Amino acid sequence: MVVALIVTLAVLAWAIIAPDNLAETGTNLQSWVVVNFGWLFTSIMLACLIFLLAIAILPTGKIRLGADDSAPDFSRASWISMLFAAGLGIALVFYGPMEPLTHFLTPPPYETVEAATQDAVVPAIVQGMLHQATLPWTVYALVGGSLAYAAYRRGRLPLISSLFEPVVTNANNRIAGKIIDVFAVLVTLFGTATSLGIGALQIRTGTSIVTGRPLEGNGIIVVIISVLTVLFIISAMTGIQKGIRMMSNLNLGLVIGLAGFVLITGPTLYLLDLVPASIMQFFDRFIDMMSIAPSQGPVEEEFALAWTILFWAWWISWSPFVGMFIAKISRGRTIREYVAVILLVPTSLTTVWFVIFGGTAAKSELDGNPIPIEGSGENVMFDLLGYLPLSGFTNIVVLITIVIFFNTAADSATNVMGSMSQSGRPVPSTPMVIIWGSALGAISLFLLLAGGEDTLSGLQSIMVSASLPFTIILIGIMYCWAKDLARDPVILRQNFATAAIDQGVRRGLDEHNGNFIFGADPVPQSQGAGAEFEKDDPNLSEWYTEVASEEYLSEQAKERDKQEKERETFKESLDADGHAQPVSEADESAPPEQTDTPEKN
């Protein structure tokens, strides 16, 4: 924790003393990373998707994130609402109308449609779906699932470094492991602080629109961040069970209600037509959208730098924070349920949200009601609602939604940083929550006071660049988790059953020419189907390799005659109830003593 705090203070001092230098350095570094490693970011996003689908479809999908009999900690509705709030949050309100509108006015390079026409509507929505829907959740699900598995099923510390235990013993106590954990804390801190700073700007814009008064200057920013910091620290101190769950459930209701209102009062039939069209075009254009690369030309480079590769890097940089939070709330789920829900439910909700708000924004432009994209675009949502009925009320709902998203993101980040700073402690101590919550609020505030949006953008660029080494960590996480899953008791039991049945079939064919049935006759312990199955044996996978091999079966065949005789002797020694009768070592030939139990008629 000390190292993380020192780095935090150093970066904060940099932002205060030389904000322009921070912004310039971040922009240059981000450009270099995107141009030279854009291919890696795209490849990692696809690899994560394929990996998750594989472990969900294969027998590993039956494995539970916890003990075999563990039950989920939260209802499915609460679980989904917390996933939604942590994984998207402010970005949903911000990018929902703004990104599709931007692509509608300026189509992506691979599109041949004319800008600001009906033909440009669906491609614009689909591009936003690519950036915000399924693929971001693949990275979150990978980190969260591997952490939940390691912590709740393997009993390891819930730290990023602990994920490498399958290949490096005691990884979290090694220098490399500690560096990874400190890096995860810093990425969480600065990444969240940057987003919260942008959220504070949105709240200022919304407050100005709701009150009808222009709110400029640093004073309002100080008030907004100070009040919200106190609120999310109090919420974080109540823990996930109360604070985050309550706010997430409330916000999910507000989001659904707001989307339903816009759908009903907006161009309803137009939006309903866009839903299937957008889904079909998403799959049709998926390869084209994923294939865009900086090396294809200056236009493609500019687009990748501003959108696609930027988003991949940004989601990867957020994965330690969001993944660890998802792990905290996902105990008791099977891997199949975990992957299915995380990939399908947020994707579906995000798709509907982008269709409703992006489609309404585009239709507004087509109908001659322009929506200017001012500054970073925090005005778009409010301007869009201004063309619909009850805009005064809906603006207040949006403002409340942003405030709650602000709090849930900061609350979740504070809990995660506190946990990581205390060696994975499930519930961080109150002082630790206060320390990291205060640091998060202070950094958001001072970055805005020092250089405004430019400083925030510069820090965001640095955090995006910091995601480059984490792409390598993601590759390691996939390898280590796959290795763990291959040695999971569920898989080994299945492998053992397969081997045992295989041996039985071979023997039945050899000895009885196929005229046999499987049974469960009692045999000496040394000859049982699980005779060599040692659940505590660290080389259990090697055991399975041996037991399923031809060589092993051949060796067993040589002893069949001896074993058959032992089985017959054992059966003869059973009493009427099928239990083995104790035999005295002093006189093995002595018959068992008579008991007072009456004979059966």
Q: Where are the model-predicted features located?
A:
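Inter-helical loop and helix-membrane interface segments of multi-pass membrane transporters/permeases
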Residues: P19-V35, P59-S75, Y95-F183, G197-V223, ...
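Transmembrane alpha-helical segments of multi-pass small-molecule transport proteins
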Residues: V3-I17, T42-I50, P214-T238, G257-L258, ...
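Helix-loop-helix module between adjacent transmembrane segments
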Residues: V2, I6-I16, L49-A54, L88-L92, ...
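Hydrophobic alpha-helical segments of multi-pass membrane transport proteins
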Residues: V7, L40-I57, V255-G266, L349-G359, ...
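Alpha-helical transmembrane segments and their helix-start/interface "positive-inside/aromatic belt" motifs
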Residues: M1-L5, F37-S43, A71-L92, W137-T138, ...
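N-terminal alpha-helical transmembrane segments of multi-pass membrane transport
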Residues: M1-Q118, C480, D484-L485, E550, ...
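Long, low-complexity, intrinsically disordered cytosolic termini of multi-pass membrane proteins
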Residues: F496-N601
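Membrane-embedded translocation segments of transport machinery
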Residues: N172, I179, A184-R333, A340, ...
